[in-house]
Amino acid sequence: MLIRRRALWLTIPILIIMTSHKIMCAFDLSHVHSESCLKIQDISSDTINFTPNLVMFRFFSNETHSDVFHLPKCIFDSKLTSYLFDHLNIYEDVSVYKNNFEKYYMGSVEGTYRTIIIKGEDTTPYLDKTTAPTVEITEKDLIITYQGIRYMNPFPVLSLIDDESCEVFDDINELILPYFGKCRKFYLNFGSVTLFGHITSNFVTIKYTAQNGTDPYTIRLFFGNSAEIVHTLPFEAQDLALRMMMYDDFEIIGEVGPVKEMLKSFKLSLLDSLLEQNHEDVMNDFRHVFEAFYNHIKKIRDGSIDIKSLHIEQLLDSLLAYSIGYYIQYRYPPYTGKWRGIEHFIETETYIHMVPELFDLFAHNMTVKTPTRPNAIKFINILIRLYSYTDYTKLDHRGLSLYFLKYIYQGNVTDDIATYAHRYMTNLYTKYTYPKTQEGEHLYKSYNDSLDTFILNTIGLKSKNKTLLHHILLLQTGMCNIQNMIGHFHSLQNNDPKFGALLSPCYRSLRYDLTAKKIGQLITKESLEPYGRLVNMVRFMTKNSSMLNVLKCELPEDDGLLAIATVDNKTYIISSRPIAVGVVYKATYTAINLFLYVTRIQNNTCIHIDKVYRDGDVKAVYTFSLDTAKDCGDMCPSVLVEYQTNTGFIGIHVINSIADIQYISENRKLFPESSHYLWLLKNDTVLELEGTNFFLFSSKSPGAIVLYIIIISLIVWTLYEIIKLFCYKRQWQYQKL
């Protein structure tokens, strides 16, 4: 049984806040001091008479007994007191209290209240400092190694020590008194609705205002330790709570009608599942985040949710689970008596800072105000050194996660992060575009690789390093291909809601032609109509995504734009008609009424055009002889634009090295004979490659010369034998005659 002490109804809460930090809030706390508001000379006087400076409160428990309370008058002259009293509504009469009870949603009245008993275990790898007899101190007060596993001190990395102080519940009509303390703010934009959130060391809260027809309504969600907040009269935590546990409560604060409507989309059964399985396990919280997103995507795919039926409540399941995980990761008090597994920290902390990017795909924008974290930066640098990622040769998921967290904590992409990200992106692209198996590969054979592609996209978009940005976006546009679309479609059917399974390199690439119709044209072996609905939804929510990162203007996606390719410092617009000022190259082998144009623009500045444009000279090439002993030169990086006569634009292939060209030459079965290619070189040359064996290789290396001599000798010897045989046969026929 869960037992809570209920305060007396007539108790007046007096909240005194002492702080040395600057607090950003509606009330200016600079006037709050720790000394008494009574004059010092009055207190030190021999004959103290406090009566003129006191206010007396007398409460009768019966006719003969009463309790008397004296409070200094100066308390009521305080600006802070006036501010708090404005939120208390103490002058309202009983009828107003009654109306509020009927107006606001209460779980106990509506029959939705439940007490939750946690059944699952917290599987977070902790190590008790007092029970570990022999540990290796890797870094004093920060890292230890026990039985081959590294552990960390959660403090100060997993704390809000670097965050600004702020005020929560500052609106005059809130049912909770203002709370002052350290907090991390986040925002989510969904159409015309802006959702505000605060993560503190004691709770997390979310508030948004939306429209029900023409009437606006406000709803606040609260999860955490309700003992750390004070509700306004006549409410207490028990009145507003829908779920209560030993340490944390879940409250919904809103009027009856809007909350009932919200609960049609926001399923309390999913929250119950999370809480019963143990929400104190952060990894468990994120499993529920991904499962909620998986269910949301499933509804988009089957048509239950479309663009016209979108509303904020459809994302509240995943948003609340994410907020709970964030709060648990940073809550107070930290596990000061326990060390925490570093591998677990890296994974959960990466999820915490990457999930907002996932929300960006299905809402219009999500922002978390993360401060600069000096202690955390120092800690991550230690881990990068300990795990041997400083020389950029060890490219794996953990290394990328560490460099990503370094970017998050310091707020900018430094050269070391850019170098690691650049190499990692090249490695991923080569792995799946030019695979060693010599078979068509897709990204979803490893969900970590899919997640890493999304992490790299985030680093690139947030970087001021244009070389890195162009490199990542170009390669991810290339990875938005038929194999990866089919792989993603199947991964969403496997009922395996992992983070990587939810993502596609198409989501924030520079490819804009993937309508449901185009996907049907590209993939004819099976119907991907449900996948087309998903791509259309993300395209709608992330309109012109990544475009303004490479262009100084915005091109309309529905006006013939197919893709954008950034080759070295050149930008090419691939479209079904000329749409920007520049040098325009037209593909040759397209059907009637089907066109493909490539426009090279200057200085990333695009000016929209309608009809008049400058033709570029496209050189037709049947074979292209390359020397493997030489550098790539103007051919690296370069882009092959693939298209077909009846389908039009298929995709792009990025060439980063001479090995990529050699791979294409040796694995022509991976490149359909029905396709044609425009080759965009970085020296402003555009070639049209014709035929199926357009790359021929030569070499001047000694080994190759010896090999060629042997081959030529064999050819000469074979010809000699054929001629000899022919001559012998003719001679025999002559003799017979």
Swiss-Prot record:
Q: How does it sit in the membrane?
A: Single-pass type I membrane protein
Parts of the chain that traverse the membrane: 703-723
Give a yes or no for keyword Translocase in this entry.
no
Q: Which UniProt keywords apply?
A: Fusion of virus membrane with host cell membrane, Fusion of virus membrane with host membrane, Glycoprotein, Host cell membrane, Host endosome, Host membrane, Membrane, Sialic acid, Signal, Transmembrane, Transmembrane helix, Viral envelope protein, Viral penetration into host cytoplasm, Virion, Virus entry into host cell
Biological process (GO), any one = symbiont entry into host cell
Identify the glycosylated residues.
N62, N212, N365, N412, N448, N465, N544, N569, N603, N683
Region (Interaction with gL) spans which residues?
A: 191-253
What do we know about how this protein assembles, alone or with others? Interacts with glycoprotein L (gL); this interaction is necessary for the correct processing and cell surface expression of gH. The heterodimer gH/gL seems to interact with gB trimers during fusion.
Name of protein: Envelope glycoprotein H
**Recorded name of the encoding gene:** gH
